Amino acid sequence: LLLHAQHIYILGVRSSSFLAGYLNFYFHLLFKNVIYVQNTAAGEIYEQMIHIGPGDVMVGISFPRYSNMGIHAIQLAHDRGADVVAITDSQLSPLYPLATAALLVSYVDSLAAPLSLINALILAVGQRKRDEVAQVFADMEQVWSKYSIFGKAEDE
């Protein structure tokens, strides 16, 4: 789904927003078509998703206690014909029935397991796009070097 999406929307609300931000950081390096749905206010979420539709993929991340704001936004994506990749904890999650594909991971008041799953997803996509990723990182290395983005250890 992700490799052929016209646009990839990423959404996580409350504690899941950290996971969504992490996924967004790396997906921006892997894809040119990522939209990170910021959730500063309920109305803004829908404004950022106004163009979502068939051919798009919404990656929705939600764990107990499931935020209604996130559930409703993912429902909108589903209703507009976008595929939904749900990253959640169980088949009882309100995201599960909306999902085209569900990635289930244990969650007991810790983001460690969901973060590991997201890392595995990033690595799997990176493997599929190996040549493109190599070119992106070669380009990034040139930019980082030219503009002295990173400091160096004293012994380098």
Region locations from a protein language model:
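A short, well-structured juxtamembrane/interface segment
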Residues: L1-H4
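Glycine-rich phosphate-binding loops that contact phosphosugars or nucleotide phosphates
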Residues: Q6-V13, S17-S116, A120-K129
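Internal, active-site/partner-interface "lid" segment
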Residues: R128-E156
